[in-house]
Structure formats: structure tokens, C-alpha cells
Amino acid sequence: MVVKVGIAKLGNIASGVMAELLLDERADREDMQTFMATSGTKLQPEDIDRVVTNMKAWGPDFCIVVSPNGVLPGPKGAREALAAAGIPCVVITDDITTKKEEWEALKASEFGYVIMKGDSMIGARREFLDPIEMADYNGNLIKVLSITGAFRKLQVALDEVIDQVKAGKKGKDLALPKLVMTSDKAVEGEFSNPYAYAKARAAYEIAQAVAGVNVKGCFMTKGFENYTPIVASAHEMMRQAMLLCEEAREMEKATDAVIRKPHKNDGTRVAKKTLISKPE
């Protein structure tokens, strides 16, 4: 059986850059196929409608809906429209979602969710953020989410839904993930060296804190001379988080203890810990 996995990418968060790639890292899985429909950078109604129309036409077994602030009207409307068409949805979004009144409704709903607390909003002030700064920030953030283990936990949660479809479940019978990616959850089981573990955990805590600094710089501070250094400091925080992650991974390399968990062609997840060995 080939499982059809849809990815509806609405706007951008770092997790959305990697969503489908985490499921098929070498593009050789034979048990699944993915289709991504994107609204581009914006969340306008016409952009959302285009994504929903294309996704319904493809007819996935389930759909991953990735967006910032998952309780905004656009992302909320998209998943509700897909659900009405009989397509189960897993929401991947940032921690801003949990600060809104609608969070309780999402938790109690039929939708799955993965809240990436470390996937913090960018410092979106024109005086600071140009295309290169944007790309640099996302590169640092992707490294933090990768090395801490947050992306692995996200990938496994989605793989488990694929496994259920392969086992014959569908629609409302699917057990969808309901996961809040805290620092403890992200780093769990990822490191053998306790100092590497501590560095990675510190990195994720810093990455989470970046959101609050950028909220202050983007929405709570007037005057470019005041808000520009605030958002710049948030980006420096993310860079330091990335450097901590690099240090943690190098420590694991030094003792030949980097954990690798690739997919086989049939989607089975295997694992290895020493570099010169076969995954089992």
C-alpha cells in the first residue's frame, strides 16, 4: 500500500521547510508519497482557498497543516474545510498558538497537533530583516530543531500515523498525535554525553525564549532606534542556540555516539549509533 500524505503549508515556520523531507530523507520510500500545496508567504483567504482546493483534489489519506499561529482564521479554516472533506489533519504550528483563547478548543478537537515551542517567530522589522537575514535565521533555527531532537520526535509522530494507514485504519479511526514539543521532550533519548544533553537542552530553551523577545520588538516597541536592537538581539540568541547545538553534536561525534535513525525503503525505521556500522 502507498500512503498519500498531504502537506498544506500556510505561510512559513521553520518546521514547514522540512515537514515532508523528514519523512523521506533519501527520496526512496516506496510505501508513501507526498504532495505539498502552499499559500506562499501570505495567509490571505484566496491563498488558503487555493491550497484547500488542490489538496482536496489530490485526496490524501491525511494532511499535515503547517502554519504560524495555528488558531488564525486562515489555518483554522483550512483544516476545518479539509476535515469536512473527510481528510484527517495534523496541525504543526508554533507556541504562539498556546497563548490564544482558541488553544483549548484545538486541544479538545478531533485534529492532531504538534506544537513546536522552539520554532520561534522571526524579527520581522524592515529596518533589520532583509532576505539574507531571514534565510540565516531560519538556517540557525532548523539546526536547533534538528540537533536537539525536536524534528526527530515530529517525524516519528507523523510516521506513526502513516503506519496506522498502512495497517488499514482511515479517517476518524486514526489516532493523531497531540504533542507539545518542550525542551525535555525534544532532547529525550538523543544524547549519551550528559554535557551534550545539557547544551542541547539549553539551546532549545534559548530558542523558545526568542519568540518573546521578537514579540516585544515587533509589536510592543515604538521607534526604529528602539525596536531594531531588540529584534537583532533575538537573532543573536538563535545564533548562540545553534552554536550550542553544534557543540553538542561534536561532543557526540567525539565518542562515536551520534544516533542515526534512517528509513528503509518500506518505511521501517532502523537505528545505529556508531559511524561504521549498519542500521538495524
Curated annotation (Swiss-Prot):
Keyword Oxidoreductase: yes
Enzyme class: oxidoreductase
SUPFAM superfamilies: F420-dependent methylenetetrahydromethanopterin dehydrogenase (MTD)
Molecular functions (GO terms): ferredoxin hydrogenase activity; methylenetetrahydromethanopterin dehydrogenase activity
InterPro entries: MTD, MTD_sf
Domain of life: Archaea
Pathway involvement of the protein, from the record: One-carbon metabolism; methanogenesis from CO(2); 5,10-methylene-5,6,7,8-tetrahydromethanopterin from 5,10-methenyl-5,6,7,8-tetrahydromethanopterin (coenzyme F420 route): step 1/1
UniProt family annotation: Belongs to the MTD family.
Protein name: F420-dependent methylenetetrahydromethanopterin dehydrogenase
Organism, scientific name: Methanospirillum hungatei JF-1 (strain ATCC 27890 / DSM 864 / NBRC 100397 / JF-1)
Highest classification ranks of the organism: Archaea, Methanobacteriati, Methanobacteriota, Stenosarchaea group, Methanomicrobia
